[in-house]
A protein has these predicted regions:
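An N-terminal assembly and electron-transfer interface module characteristic of large anaerobic redox
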Residues: 1-212
Length: 212
């Protein structure tokens, strides 16, 4: 790592490390935070191309078409089936929720703390436009016994699955290193898979090596 020419920062958690490497090792970094907004994803790649002196040319026509196809298929199958998610699953839970809501999905609950960085605008938009969505702070010892059970829903993240006792859990943790169009499409495909096939939450938690 000390011989790297460039650090690409995709998570706020790594910013201090990037700053220290820039200061101590003279390794520059560029902020390209992960996003679930197709326009922002394109801007990230354009920004990276600009940084590299326009030596890189990207064509995402196939990826965008695949994403549109996945959204349509998922919407046709899920219809108004409830979706809940948490901040352990994705870096920016409010942005991802906003993406789902904008595409007509029935997001019911978001288990997350205060929004960070680019997530603030999406947080405010959800509060303003989608007043039926419940915003819940998960880190409360009484939360497990709160009336948040919603077994018939797709829960994205182990935490939301645990708190709702969902039968359909997407065992995503820290985005599993996913990024860009591929990452967004992958998450949507996992939502579809979890809807079609009931999941064993206990098995997902044990596979992730977590202690509840």
């Amino acid at each position: 790592m000390a011989k790297s020419k460039l650090n690409v920062l995709i998570s706020p958690k790594a910013k201090m490390a990037c700053e220290l490497m820039e200061k101590n090792l003279k390794i520059p970094y560029i902020e390209l935070y992960n996003s679930y907004n197709p326009e922002n994803i394109l801007q990230n790649y354009e920004k990276f191309s600009d940084y590299m002196g326009n030596r890189l040319k990207f064509d995402f026509e196939i990826e965008i078409n695949n994403l549109d196809k996945t959204i349509r298929e998922l919407k046709n199958i899920l219809k108004d089936f409830p979706i809940v998610l948490d901040e352990e699953a994705v870096l920016f839970p409010y942005e991802f929720s906003d993406f789902l809501l904008q595409n007509g999905f029935n997001v019911k609950k978001i288990f997350a703390t205060s929004p960070k960085l680019t997530d603030i605008d999406y947080f405010n938009n959800i509060k303003k436009r989608y007043k039926d969505v419940k915003l819940i702070i998960p880190y409360n010892p009484k939360q497990r016994f709160a009336p948040e059970k919603l077994e018939e829903c797709v829960s994205i993240g182990l935490e939301s699955g645990y708190l709702t006792s969902s039968f359909h859990n997407v065992g995503l943790c820290g985005e599993d290193g996913l990024y860009g169009f591929f990452g967004l499409n992958y998450i949507l495909e996992k939502i579809l898979d979890s809807y079609k096939n009931k999941t064993d939450l206990k098995e997902n938690i044990e596979r992730a090596g977590l202690v509840v």
